[in-house]
Protein backbone atom coordinates (compact mmCIF):
# COMPACT_ATOMS: atom_id res chain seq x y z
CA UNK A 1 0.00 0.00 0.00
CA UNK A 2 1.27 3.43 -0.85
CA UNK A 3 2.40 5.32 2.22
CA UNK A 4 2.49 2.25 4.45
CA UNK A 5 6.18 1.54 4.86
CA UNK A 6 8.19 -0.89 6.94
CA UNK A 7 8.51 1.44 9.92
CA UNK A 8 4.75 2.01 10.12
CA UNK A 9 4.06 -1.71 9.68
CA UNK A 10 6.62 -2.62 12.35
CA UNK A 11 5.12 -0.07 14.74
CA UNK A 12 1.61 -1.39 14.16
CA UNK A 13 2.70 -5.00 14.61
CA UNK A 14 4.72 -4.16 17.73
CA UNK A 15 1.67 -2.41 19.18
CA UNK A 16 -0.54 -5.39 18.35
CA UNK A 17 1.91 -7.94 19.76
CA UNK A 18 2.35 -5.91 22.95
CA UNK A 19 -1.29 -6.79 23.71
CA UNK A 20 -0.74 -10.52 23.16
CA UNK A 21 0.64 -12.76 25.89
CA UNK A 22 3.67 -14.84 24.99
CA UNK A 23 4.34 -16.92 23.13
CA UNK A 24 3.63 -14.61 20.21
CA UNK A 25 3.39 -16.15 16.81
CA UNK A 26 2.23 -15.70 13.28
CA UNK A 27 1.41 -18.08 10.43
CA UNK A 28 1.79 -17.08 6.81
CA UNK A 29 0.85 -19.15 3.79
CA UNK A 30 2.21 -16.53 1.40
CA UNK A 31 5.65 -15.18 0.67
CA UNK A 32 6.14 -11.95 2.66
CA UNK A 33 9.29 -10.01 3.44
CA UNK A 34 10.89 -12.73 5.58
CA UNK A 35 13.68 -10.48 6.82
CA UNK A 36 11.09 -8.05 8.15
CA UNK A 37 9.08 -10.79 9.91
CA UNK A 38 12.07 -12.62 11.35
CA UNK A 39 13.19 -9.39 12.99
CA UNK A 40 9.87 -8.73 14.75
CA UNK A 41 9.41 -9.55 18.44
CA UNK A 42 7.97 -12.99 17.63
CA UNK A 43 8.41 -16.27 19.44
CA UNK A 44 6.93 -18.53 16.76
CA UNK A 45 6.96 -18.24 12.99
CA UNK A 46 4.81 -20.73 11.10
CA UNK A 47 5.14 -20.83 7.34
CA UNK A 48 4.29 -22.74 4.19
CA UNK A 49 7.78 -24.03 3.48
CA UNK A 50 6.34 -26.56 1.02
CA UNK A 51 5.69 -23.69 -1.41
CA UNK A 52 8.23 -21.09 -0.25
CA UNK A 53 11.29 -23.19 0.64
CA UNK A 54 13.77 -21.75 -1.83
CA UNK A 55 12.93 -18.14 -1.08
CA UNK A 56 12.79 -18.68 2.70
CA UNK A 57 16.20 -20.41 2.66
CA UNK A 58 17.73 -17.31 1.10
CA UNK A 59 17.16 -15.50 4.43
CA UNK A 60 19.64 -17.66 6.35
CA UNK A 61 21.15 -14.77 8.33
CA UNK A 62 17.76 -13.58 9.60
CA UNK A 63 16.71 -17.18 10.32
CA UNK A 64 19.92 -17.77 12.31
CA UNK A 65 19.33 -14.62 14.38
CA UNK A 66 15.68 -15.56 14.97
CA UNK A 67 16.72 -18.98 16.26
CA UNK A 68 19.47 -17.45 18.41
CA UNK A 69 16.72 -15.38 20.09
CA UNK A 70 15.08 -18.75 20.89
CA UNK A 71 12.47 -18.38 18.17
CA UNK A 72 10.58 -21.45 17.00
CA UNK A 73 10.02 -22.20 13.33
CA UNK A 74 6.99 -24.27 12.38
CA UNK A 75 7.85 -25.84 9.05
CA UNK A 76 4.60 -26.26 7.11
CA UNK A 77 5.71 -29.06 4.83
CA UNK A 78 2.60 -31.21 4.32
CA UNK A 79 0.25 -29.79 1.66
CA UNK A 80 -3.46 -29.88 2.45
CA UNK A 81 -4.77 -29.28 -1.05
CA UNK A 82 -6.25 -32.46 -2.54
CA UNK A 83 -4.27 -32.54 -5.80
CA UNK A 84 -0.93 -31.51 -4.28
CA UNK A 85 -1.27 -33.96 -1.39
CA UNK A 86 -1.99 -36.80 -3.85
CA UNK A 87 1.33 -36.16 -5.64
CA UNK A 88 3.44 -36.54 -2.50
CA UNK A 89 4.37 -39.22 -0.04
CA UNK A 90 5.94 -38.90 3.37
CA UNK A 91 9.45 -39.61 2.13
CA UNK A 92 9.29 -37.02 -0.65
CA UNK A 93 8.12 -34.39 1.85
CA UNK A 94 10.89 -35.29 4.30
CA UNK A 95 13.42 -35.00 1.49
CA UNK A 96 11.98 -31.63 0.50
CA UNK A 97 12.26 -30.37 4.09
CA UNK A 98 15.75 -31.75 4.62
CA UNK A 99 16.90 -30.06 1.41
CA UNK A 100 15.90 -26.69 2.89
CA UNK A 101 17.57 -27.56 6.17
CA UNK A 102 20.82 -28.56 4.41
CA UNK A 103 20.88 -25.24 2.56
CA UNK A 104 20.45 -23.37 5.85
CA UNK A 105 23.08 -25.45 7.64
CA UNK A 106 25.44 -24.76 4.74
CA UNK A 107 24.83 -21.03 5.22
CA UNK A 108 25.77 -21.10 8.89
CA UNK A 109 22.49 -21.87 10.67
CA UNK A 110 23.34 -24.09 13.65
CA UNK A 111 21.95 -27.58 13.01
CA UNK A 112 21.36 -28.57 16.64
CA UNK A 113 19.72 -25.27 17.55
CA UNK A 114 17.49 -25.38 14.49
CA UNK A 115 16.36 -28.95 15.14
CA UNK A 116 15.67 -28.12 18.79
CA UNK A 117 13.64 -25.02 17.80
CA UNK A 118 11.59 -26.68 15.04
CA UNK A 119 8.11 -28.10 14.69
CA UNK A 120 6.38 -29.41 11.59
CA UNK A 121 2.83 -28.83 10.46
CA UNK A 122 0.53 -28.80 7.47
CA UNK A 123 1.62 -26.17 4.95
CA UNK A 124 -1.66 -24.31 4.68
CA UNK A 125 -5.11 -24.11 6.20
CA UNK A 126 -6.96 -25.47 3.15
CA UNK A 127 -10.40 -26.75 4.10
CA UNK A 128 -12.02 -26.70 0.66
CA UNK A 129 -11.28 -29.96 -1.12
CA UNK A 130 -13.32 -32.31 -3.30
CA UNK A 131 -13.12 -34.88 -0.49
CA UNK A 132 -14.13 -32.28 2.11
CA UNK A 133 -12.00 -32.69 5.25
CA UNK A 134 -10.46 -36.08 4.39
CA UNK A 135 -7.24 -34.70 2.83
CA UNK A 136 -6.72 -32.35 5.78
CA UNK A 137 -7.15 -35.25 8.22
CA UNK A 138 -4.67 -37.33 6.21
CA UNK A 139 -2.25 -34.39 6.24
CA UNK A 140 -2.35 -34.29 10.05
CA UNK A 141 -1.71 -38.04 10.20
CA UNK A 142 1.23 -37.54 7.86
CA UNK A 143 2.59 -34.73 10.06
CA UNK A 144 2.50 -37.06 13.06
CA UNK A 145 4.29 -39.84 11.18
CA UNK A 146 6.88 -37.43 9.77
CA UNK A 147 7.51 -36.05 13.22
CA UNK A 148 8.27 -39.53 14.54
CA UNK A 149 10.64 -40.28 11.65
CA UNK A 150 12.47 -36.96 12.06
CA UNK A 151 12.71 -37.34 15.85
CA UNK A 152 14.28 -40.77 15.43
CA UNK A 153 16.75 -39.42 12.90
CA UNK A 154 17.75 -36.16 14.58
CA UNK A 155 17.13 -36.46 18.33
Q: Predicted regions span which residues?
A:
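Catalytic-face loop-and-helix region of soluble metabolic enzyme cores
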Residues: 43-153
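Active-site loop segments of alpha/beta catalytic cores
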Residues: 1-59
Amino acid sequence: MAGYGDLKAKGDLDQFFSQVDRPRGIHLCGNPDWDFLLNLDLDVLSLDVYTNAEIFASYATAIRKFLERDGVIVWGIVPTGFETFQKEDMHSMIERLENVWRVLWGKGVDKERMIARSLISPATCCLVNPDRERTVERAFVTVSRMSNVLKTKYL
